[in-house]
């Protein structure tokens, strides 16, 4: 009886696998068990409905295995992470590794081309042993820093030149305005001088007389008639000033010392020798 029950379980499970697309809840397990019994058996059914839970567990396990295999087959074409023991999964993993290798080759080729371009842009060094990727990137970084500093210095110089240009433009505008004012003033002066030349000449004479010294001379036309008339006296003719230098009588022999001067004989003092030559009394 137990062997017949096990055989009935196997047959029922095979039928359930054939109709796996159906839902378990919609299955009539009683009908399946009744149809699974052979016509020559002594009992009408091989097992009763108490084995329904066991059949449900077997069928759910089979469905889980089928879903797992289908998910592995679908994901193997997009990524190489999941691994399935079925042959389609292994084939998809090989394709994914090949695609990954091709992508890696392309990436390395692009990186090599970028390094060659960078080597042409960055100034080279004399030491050939330092031409590594790290050394190239270091030199490129230093070169970029130098370019940034140079650009900052050039921008500062440009700003200074712009400020100086603005100052020069403002100074030029001020000079032009001053020149216009000077021209307008000169034109106004010329207009006034043409309208009143006599007044300008008199004002110029008064101004020049104030600025420069003036020597007054006797002029009968410029003096009133009742003023005292000055007289011109010739000092030389009148004998008030001698025509030659005043000299005193000197001794014939110069003394050598004070004692010789004291021992000189007395001479008569003549006052007329000290008077002017042309003195008239």
Swiss-Prot record:
Keywords (alphabetical) are: Coiled coil, DNA-binding, Nucleus, Transcription, Transcription regulation, Ubl conjugation
The ranges of region (Disordered) come to 71-105, 189-213
Q: Where in the cell is it found?
A: Nucleus
SUPFAM superfamilies (UniProt xref): HLH, helix-loop-helix DNA-binding domain
Q: Which stretches are annotated as coiled coil?
A: 144-185
Q: What happens when the gene is disrupted?
A: Does not suppress axon regeneration defect in mxl-1 mutant background. Suppresses the axon regeneration defect in sdz-33 mutant background. RNAi-mediated knockdown increases lifespan, which is abolished on an mxl-2 or mml-1 mutant background, or by simultaneous RNAi-mediated knockdown of daf-16 or pha-4. RNAi-mediated knockdown causes delayed onset of polyglutamine-mediated paralysis. RNAi-mediated knockdown reduces spore levels of the microsporidian pathogen N.parisii during infection, further reduced on an mxl-2 mutant background.
Q: Where is this region: Helix-loop-helix motif?
A: 109-147
Database matches in Gene3D superfamilies: Helix-loop-helix DNA-binding domain
One annotated GO molecular function is: protein heterodimerization activity
Q: Which Pfam families match?
A: HLH (PF00010)
Give a brief account of the tissues where this protein occurs: Expressed in intestinal cells in adults. Expressed in D-type motor neuron cell bodies.
Q: Which InterPro entries does the protein's record reference?
A: bHLH_dom, HLH_DNA-bd_sf
Q: Which residue stretches does the UniProt record annotate as biased composition, category Low complexity?
A: 71-80, 200-212
What the entry lists under SMART domains is as follows: HLH (SM00353)
Q: Where is this region: Basic motif?
A: 95-108
Q: How is it modified after translation?
A: Ubiquitinated.
A Gene Ontology BP annotation from the UniProt entry: regulation of cell differentiation
Q: Which domain of life is it from?
A: Eukaryota
Assembly description:
Forms heterodimer with mxl-1 in the presence and absence of DNA.
What role is this protein assigned? Transcriptional regulator which binds to the E box motif 5'-CACGTG-3', when in a heterodimeric complex with mxl-1. Involved in the control of lifespan in response to dietary restriction, the decline in protein homeostasis associated with normal aging, germline signaling and may overlap with the insulin-like signaling pathway. Plays a role in autophagy. Involved in promoting infection by the microsporidian pathogen N.parisii, possibly together with transcription factors pha-4 and zip-10.
What is the name of the protein in this document?
A: Mad-like protein 1
User: In which organism is this protein found?
Assistant: Caenorhabditis elegans
């Amino acid at each position: 009886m137990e062997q017949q029950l096990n055989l009935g379980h196997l047959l029922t499970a095979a039928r359930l696998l054939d109709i796996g697309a159906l839902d378990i809840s919609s299955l009539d397990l009683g009908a399946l068990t009744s149809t699974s019994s052979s016509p020559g058996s002594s009992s009408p059914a091989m097992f009763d409905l108490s084995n329904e839970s066991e059949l449900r567990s077997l069928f759910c396990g089979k469905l889980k295995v089928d879903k797992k295999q289908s998910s592995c087959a679908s994901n193997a074409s997009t990524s190489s992470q999941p691994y399935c023991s079925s042959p389609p999964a292994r084939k998809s993993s090989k394709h994914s590794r090949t695609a990954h290798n091709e992508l890696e080759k392309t990436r390395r080729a692009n990186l090599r081309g970028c390094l060659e371009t960078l080597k042409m842009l960055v100034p080279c060094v004399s030491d050939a042993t330092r031409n590594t990727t790290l050394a190239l990137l270091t030199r490129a970084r230093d070169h970029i820093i130098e370019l940034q500093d140079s650009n900052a210095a050039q921008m500062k110089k440009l700003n200074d030149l712009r400020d100086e240009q603005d100052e020069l433009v403002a100074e030029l505008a001020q000079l032009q305005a001053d020149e216009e004012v000077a021209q307008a003033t000169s034109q106004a002066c010329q207009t006034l001088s043409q309208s009143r030349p006599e007044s300008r000449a008199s004002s110029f004479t008064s101004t020049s007389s104030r600025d420069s010294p003036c020597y007054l001379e006797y002029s009968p036309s410029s003096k009133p008639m009742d003023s005292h008339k000055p007289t011109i006296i010739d000092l030389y003719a009148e004998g008030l000033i001698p025509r030659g230098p005043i000299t005193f009588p000197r001794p014939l022999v110069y003394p050598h010392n004070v004692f010789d001067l004291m021992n000189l004989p007395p001479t008569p003092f003549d006052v007329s020798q000290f008077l002017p030559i042309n003195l008239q009394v």
